[in-house]
Regions:
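Conserved mixed alpha/beta catalytic, RNA-binding, or beta-rich assembly cores of soluble enzyme
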Residues: 82-148
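Short terminal or interdomain "cap/linker" segment that borders an active site or interface and mediates
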Residues: 2, 10, 92, 140-184
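Active-site helix-to-loop segments that bind/position phosphate- or nucleotide-bearing substrates
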Residues: 4-111
Length: 184
């Protein structure tokens, strides 16, 4: 595509996210249920701490999918009708890892709920980032679901390699999740 989308979303400390408690419950293993009261209280506490300290970032760009051909049978199948994609990385920042370690030392229950809160927040950042590309799509193009290293048979080790495609090496330490959104 001829248009260029710089595609960086940076949110500073104090960023608020409206997180779906059913999604948090799903990450904790609940099937269609709500968070139980203790988990809901821990989730609210974790979210408050995260909102006050983390710096969420999303960075990516559009590129040819030939770079990924042959890396995974499942990825090749996912890309079979595609000509280009959006390679992007998402992070809640290094402070998130520090909080998760601190929560692990305080309470494994809080650490588990905190991990679920982080996962839902990352999912929302991914969805928001991908939605930012919708106005740039040409007639007949659309987005497919994201496909990340670790999905299907795509080796999780590819995560570090995909990060090189979206950000300078010195920033990779803060980019724990890389995704490939597909244009069809």
């Amino acid at each position: 595509c001829g248009r260029r989308h710089r595609g960086e979303l940076v949110q500073g400390p104090g960023t608020r996210m409206n997180l779906d408690s059913k999604e948090i419950a799903r990450y904790l293993g609940s099937r269609g249920g709500d968070l139980w009261p203790e988990a809901a209280a821990l989730a609210a506490d974790c979210q408050r701490e995260l909102e006050g300290t983390v710096t969420p970032r999303t960075l990516g760009r559009r590129l040819s999918l030939s770079l990924f051909a042959g890396q995974s049978r499942d990825l090749d199948h996912h890309l079979r009708h595609c000509t280009e994609g959006i390679l992007f990385a998402v992070t809640l920042g290094a402070e998130t890892d520090r909080l998760l370690r601190r929560w692990s030392a305080q309470s494994m229950a809080k650490a588990a709920v905190g991990q679920a809160v982080c996962a839902v927040w990352l999912d929302q950042l991914c969805a928001d980032y991908c939605a930012s590309f919708l106005p740039t799509l040409d007639e007949g193009q659309y987005l497919t679901p994201a496909f990340s290293p670790g999905y299907g048979d795509w080796d999780l080790a590819a995560q570090r390699l995909t990060a090189y495609g979206v950000t300078p090496e010195d920033v990779i330490q803060e980019m724990p999740a890389a995704f490939l959104e597909i244009l069809r």
